[in-house]
From Swiss-Prot:
A motif (DDXXD motif 2) lies at residues 473-477. Signal peptide: none annotated. A motif (DDXXD motif 1) lies at residues 92-96. Pfam families: polyprenyl_synt, Terpene_syn_C_2. It comes from Emericella variicolor. Residues 326-713 are annotated as: Geranylgeranyl diphosphate synthase. Mg(2+) 1 binds at residues 92, 96. Its EC number is 2.5.1.-, 4.2.3.178. This is Stellatatriene synthase. GO terms for biological process: alcohol biosynthetic process; mycotoxin biosynthetic process; terpenoid biosynthetic process. Dimethylallyl diphosphate binds at residues 482, 560-561, 596, 603, 613, 623. SUPFAM superfamilies: Terpenoid synthases.
Length: 714
């Protein structure tokens, strides 16, 4: 394995207690980045969740854990990997408390699963989930391809880890099997592969896990040896008669003393370390497995040696452990600004420097963890401080009395079954969707704090209008496919589809009435008006072969695509419980511009888009997208272009050959490069808007930034 980012540590500066003889110890050249990541995580937790008490994580003097166990972590990843590892240790401490363990585990698992499958999470404003969203956003920003598999691996770890803290294990074998999972087999795989940018082939992962079992167990034994005294004290403080530690298990299983159990543990750890050295030499010589699998297996040598060195000097397990001067300085004055966000710790809190102050004594020991001095409140305090402001004069808004269930019409016969009316809508709703708008609503609620019941109504209104607009768009554009399936009108016919789509406006209005105020109705009618005006211009240009200017095109987008974004943003502002009032118009307009232009671009270059909607569908529909406007302006006298476009209008569609001809002209004219460059500018506009909103609200929105990273092209 090649070493770029670490140096060999002088054996005279550490002690392994004979637990890993023959092992080299390496340390990362940029360990201060781990300092920043770990302390940033602690500050996030204190600000978003609550006090950490006497928590001591992965930092130490002279060595941090991560810089020892993954010495070849890519430098640009060390800070966020340190953040994630620190959160895992906090998670471990919380799940040790039986009262909260399962609920905490379930919440973490649900959030990681949601991020891995949809790229978002509900309730992103909640403390713990804000931290997870920050991790995901940063990892996706750095390496999107490896971030998602890593998050999936973490979900598996959380699902298993910490769920048997009260189990009285009856044998060493039973305990070992549990700990192989709990020590973080899946978590460590995800962390290490992301940190070192490894791509272990899927068919080799189980092999790697099996080969590394020896290393897993050795690390578990060393951990239990080093943490035994701490865990004894914790168990006594919590009134537990069970200690989840190999020493306790050996004492009970074999009826031996504490010292005898420790000695047996030491001897087994020594043997396993020697065995793993031989395993690595064997696999390094194999050429029938991938290079990254071999690197993964070899990297565990440093996990073993680093874990051994750190475990016996760290403040987490040793009362004599201390922190470095650099760490103490950061604890006192706060971590540097997050380069990705411009905030001190990623969470603006209204203080002068955004830091959490921790008192330390002269020898480098933390002496006080009281964080109230910086004005930060726990979740409970925040909730009690928020006053729910309700709109006055609600009686001025009443659409009608819907309390009575309609059983019949004018007393003659039963009411007609609405299933036929709803069938087209239910069809399109059932098609696969990324749920971007629902994700955006959850993200914006980090700022607005709309009560859950009203937030669900706003989501419902948004979903109804969005799907209804898709049904009408497909009819008006003559689309064949929607999300890879036949468009709704190709299943139910034009009349049924149009009727069902129009009815959804009634349903949306019924949902709106549940909000119970006049301002919401005003927002609803204004933005619905804008949406239809925008769509009318799009249809007019297509039908009459009128090529708009780029300015006119973006005006149309702000009405049509931006209208729905503005609708839910304005509704959330109306029902916000946050006393800070901020106008989202610039943000939603910029988001609409970027989203539509991205869609225009994907229509031309994305294989997935072709699968979902067809090859260059915009050409077939005759749409004047941003790329088409650029092409028309660049080649105004090109007769091939003009005739192909006219023939599309005459025939009502375009052949594959005609579409390929237009695409070739776009490549010749530099249209694709122009569109890609435009996306970069539009994305910067959205990022600037997000930063301005974060400044006005005083809270960084990790969930919104994660969505933006996932939408980023190129």
């Amino acid at each position: 394995m090649e070493y770029k980012f670490s140096t060999v540590v002088d054996p005279g500066t550490y002690e392994t207690h004979g637990l890993c003889e023959g092992y080299e110890v390496r340390y990362h050249k940029n360990a201060e980045l781990e300092d920043i990541g770990c302390l940033r995580c602690q500050e996030h937790w204190r600000q978003s969740v609550g006090p950490l008490g006497a928590f001591k994580g992965t930092l130490g003097n002279p060595f941090n854990l991560l810089s020892l166990v993954i010495p070849e972590c890519l430098p640009d990843r060390l800070s966020i990997v340190g953040f994630a590892n620190e959160l895992a240790f906090i998670h471990d401490d919380v799940t040790d408390i039986v009262q909260y363990g399962d609920a905490h585990n379930n919440d973490f698992k649900e959030a990681f699963n949601s991020m891995a499958t949809t790229g978002s999470m509900e309730n992103a404003a909640s403390g713990k989930r804000a931290l997870q969203a920050y991790i995901a956003r940063e990892m996706v920003r750095i390496d999107k391809e490896r971030a998602i598999p890593t998050i999936k691996a973490w979900a598996k770890f959380v699902d298993y880890g910490g769920r048997q803290e009260t189990t009285r294990f009856t044998s060493e074998k039973e305990y070992t099997e549990y700990r192989i999972q709990d020590i973080g087999l899946w978590f460590w795989y995800g962390l290490l592969s992301f940190a070192m940018a490894l791509d272990v082939p899927e068919h080799e992962r189980e092999m790697c896990h099996e080969v590394c079992r020896t290393a897993y167990v050795q690390i578990m034994l060393v951990h239990d040896l080093a943490s035994w005294e701490k865990e004894k004290l914790n168990a006594a403080a919590l009134g537990k008669d069970v200690i989840t530690n190999i020493i306790f298990v050996l004492m009970e299983e074999h009826g031996i003393s504490e010292e005898e159990a420790k000695e047996r543990c030491r001897e087994t750890a020594k043997t396993l370390a020697a065995d793993y050295l031989k395993i690595v030499e064997e696999y390094k010589a194999r050429d029938d497995i991938s290079l990254d699998s071999r690197k993964y297996i070899e990297s565990w040598l440093y996990t073993i040696s680093g874990n051994t060195v750190w475990s016996f000097i760290c403040p987490r397990y040793n009362s004599s452990g201390s922190f470095s001067d650099h760490q103490l300085e950061l604890m006192k004055n706060g971590v540097p600004k997050d380069p990705a966000s411009g905030s001190t710790n990623g969470t603006s809190n209204g203080t002068s420097n955004g830091t959490s102050h921790v008192a330390v004594n002269g020898n480098g020991h933390v002496t006080n963890d009281d964080l109230s001095a910086n004005g930060i409140k726990t979740d409970g305090e925040l909730l009690s401080a928020i006053t729910m402001e309700h709109l006055k004069n609600r009686n001025s808004f009443k659409l009608g009395d819907h309390d009575q269930e309609v059983k019949s019409l004018h007393g003659h016969g039963q009411a007609l079954d609405p299933r036929v009316l709803q069938a087209p809508y239910e069809y399109i709703t059932a098609l696969p969707s990324k749920g971007l708008r629902e994700q955006a609503i959850d993200a914006l609620n980090v700022w607005f704090r709309v009560p859950t019941a009203k937030l669900e109504i706003i989501k419902s209104i948004t979903t109804i209008l969005h799907n209804a607009s898709l049904m009408l768009d497909d009819v008006e554009d003559g689309s064949e496919l929607r999300r890879g399936k036949p468009a709704t009108h190709n299943i139910f016919g034009l009349g049924q589809t149009i009727n069902s789509a129009n009815y959804q406006l009634v349903r949306a209005l019924q949902e709106l009435q549940k909000l119970g105020d006049a301002r919401s109705l005003l927002v609803f009618t204004e933005e619905l008006h804008n949406l239809y005006v925008g769509q009318s211009m799009d249809l007019y240009w297509t039908s009459n072969l009128v090529c708009p200017s780029m300015h006119e095109y973006f005006q149309m987008i702000e009405h049509k695509t931006g209208g729905l974004f503005r609708l839910f943003g304005r509704l959330m502002a109306v029902h916000s419980t946050n006393p800070v009032q901020v106008d989202l118009t610039d943000f939603t307009n910029h988001l609409g511009r970027y989203f539509q232009t991205r869609d225009d671009y994907q229509n031309l270059v994305s294989a997935e888009y072709t699968k979902q909607k067809g090859f260059c569908e915009d050409f077939e529909e005759g749409k004047f997208s941003l790329p088409m406007i650029h092409l028309m302006q660049t080649m105004p006298d090109n007769l091939v272009l003009r005739n192909v476009w006219t023939q599309r209008r005459v025939n009502g569609t375009a052949t594959h050959g005609q579409k390929q001809t237009i695409l070739n002209l776009m490549k010749e004219a530099g249209t694709l490069k122009f569109t890609q460059d435009s996306l970069g500018v539009l994305y910067s506009d959205v990022e600037k808007s997000v930063a301005e909103l974060e400044s006005k609200f005083g809270i960084e929105n990790f969930q919104l930034r994660l969505i933006m990273e996932l939408l980023k092209t190129g």
